[in-house]
Structures are given as C-alpha cells and as structure tokens.
A protein has these predicted regions:
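Catalytic metal-binding/acid-base residues of hydrolase active sites
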Residues: 55-57, 95, 116
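Conserved protein kinase catalytic core
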Residues: 18, 59, 99, 119-120
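Metallo-beta-lactamase
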Residues: 2, 70, 75-81, 85, ...
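Structural signal for conserved beta-strand scaffold positions within catalytic alpha/beta enzyme cores
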Residues: 10-12, 112
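Extreme N-terminal starter segment of soluble prokaryotic enzymes
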Residues: 4-7
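Short amphipathic alpha-helices and their capping/turn segments at secondary-structure boundaries
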Residues: 1-2, 39-45, 100-103
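Conserved beta-strand hairpin/beta-sheet module of binuclear metal-dependent hydrolase folds
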Residues: 13-74
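Active-site metal-binding motif and surrounding structural segment of the metallo-beta-lactamase
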Residues: 66-112
Length: 149
C-alpha cells in the first residue's frame, strides 16, 4: 500500500522576545532574552488541504504584547489557499496562539482531542496560572463548533 505524499508549510504570523521566566511557568526571570516565533501549518496534496492550528488575532496579540506580522489567512493566501474554503482544521491544543482565529474557517470541521476539551472546560481552569494561556471565548467557540448543530 502506497501512502499519499503531502507538502507541509510553516507560515509565520508573529513573534516575540521574552525570557524563560515570561514564557514558561517557573522559568528563571534572570535568563537571557529568548526569541519565539508563531506559526500556523498547512499540510496538503492534490486532493486535500488541512490547516493545523489557526493562530491568534491581532487584538489578542496586542493585548499580550506580541507582534502581528500578518493575519494567518493572509499567510494562507500566499499559498493560494482561501481560509473560508478549508474543510479540515486540526487544533493541537487550545492555547490562544493556536486557537484564536476559528471564525476565519467557516466551512471547516475542527479536530481536537477530547482530553484537551475536557481540560480547558474542567476544574483546572479555576487556577489563574493554568488558564493564562487560554481565551475563554476561544474555548466557548470550540465547544460550539465541535458539539453544536
């Protein structure tokens, strides 16, 4: 059996410079600067295009002090992909920088692990340190997209 071949593209839409103490829980606040880039991914072949993660929006990026180089849908357009026509989107996890532009994909079926949705709608979100990386509206939108009619 021959498996289909796919092309994989990383589309950078933002970046930041911080320290480990700012980026990771329990990081050393005395660390040197640490650069971090933000990407959405495209996996495609002649029959199918899948987007992996959808990035954050400009307003959320500004609220968190992140750069916003381009809207992820503009990055997709550079590959002649219309976000509005994508049928499958995989969300690896619900952090704001992975699940913030769900509305850009009105035709998509969203794929996310049950355990991730259980986590972001469970008791762990009562702890500020754990919920810091999530946006409540993104979580609510994902619940509607996955479980709604």
């Amino acid at each position: 059996m021959e498996l289909p071949e796919y092309e994989v593209y990383a589309i950078k839409y933002g970046d930041r410079v911080g320290t480990r103490g700012q980026i990771f829980m329990h990081g050393d606040p005395h660390d040197a600067p640490l650069a971090m880039d933000y990407f959405v991914w495209v996996v495609r072949n002649a029959e199918r295009t899948v987007v992996v993660d959808v990035g954050y929006g400009q307003a959320e990026g500004e609220r968190r002090g992140r750069s916003f180089l381009r809207c992820p849908s503009e990055g997709l357009a550079l590959l002649d992909i219309d976000a509005a026509t994508i049928e499958d989107v995989v969300i690896t996890h619900m952090h704001y920088d992975h699940a913030g532009n769900l509305e850009l994909f009105p035709a998509a079926r969203f794929h996310i692990q049950d355990d991730e949705l259980s986590f972001v709608t469970g008791r762990a979100m009562t702890y500020k340190a754990l919920r810091h990386s999530f946006v409540l509206d993104d979580v609510l939108d994902m619940v509607r997209l996955v479980y709604g009619d």
